[in-house]
Amino acid sequence: MCIRDRNAGVPLSAINHGRPLVLIDACEETPTFDTVNFPNEDGARAAVQHLIECGCHRIAIVGDGYSPRTELAHVESSSGLRLRGASGALLDAGLPYDESTNFIGYGSDSGIEAGHAIAEAMLEARAQSADDTAESRSPGTTRATGGTPAIDGIFCINDYAAFGVIRGLADYGIRVPDDVKVIGFDGATAGSYTTPTLSTVQVDLDQLAQFALDMITRRVEQRDQGDGRSDESAGMPATRATIGYTLVPRESTVFRLYISPSPRDRTSARMPSSA
């Protein structure tokens, strides 16, 4: 098995040497090797929909930074697909998706920086709102008031970025989930022990292992029944599967009193099929 991002720039033929190979989360539209992908787009969409269901109206995305929707149409990366799913959920709900709600952060350290930037934006929006309120109460006011509302929800492209974001927000006195709600992606075990515990999109790693094993077994059996040629020259088309996920609401989006005793399964996996 091969995690594509960790072998970027290395020809796959130099890795497999004619042996069965399964790529993990390669995200290619037309794969040349058997591939098992994470539920990147659907999972991100579900995460943002959860924030919306929790009452969020201005949702920030922490990941690779802003990309126009036209550029997301044919992305072939997990981060790009997650951004496509998240932005699609925002636009479908009539909520803003623009540069002002996108922040760069892919790990804990950059997540802290993103948390600081979001906190500063929130405090600025609060100050503007206070100024507008004071002005609207002044005698003789005729000018329309009302600035950009403060960010009240954050979707992070992975859990470790979310850990950093929560820390960065805390540095500015921003409370989660009281002031802003945060959700991550992947289902890192540490999210069960943080304060607050982290809401996340839990990917089915057991299913990933099973799909990958089934693909390798199929290739080996096909080769043994044939003339011993490499898998790719044997003419059997590459297959692609997407594992399932579970939306796990925890304290970072839902107050402890309202946490569901069991996570909600928001989708089923897509079984292996020819690309």
Where are these predicted regions, by residue range?
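Bacterial carbohydrate/catabolite-sensing allosteric modules
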Residues: 15-257, 275
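Conserved small/polar residues in nucleotide/adenosyl-binding loops
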Residues: 1-5, 257-263
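Short, charged beta->alpha transition segments
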Residues: 8-11, 47
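Generic N-terminal leader/processing signal
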Residues: 1-2, 133, 230, 266-269
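A short, hydrophobic C-terminal helix/tail in secreted or cell-surface proteins
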Residues: 260-272
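Central regulatory/effector-binding core of bacterial HTH transcription factors
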Residues: 4-9, 29
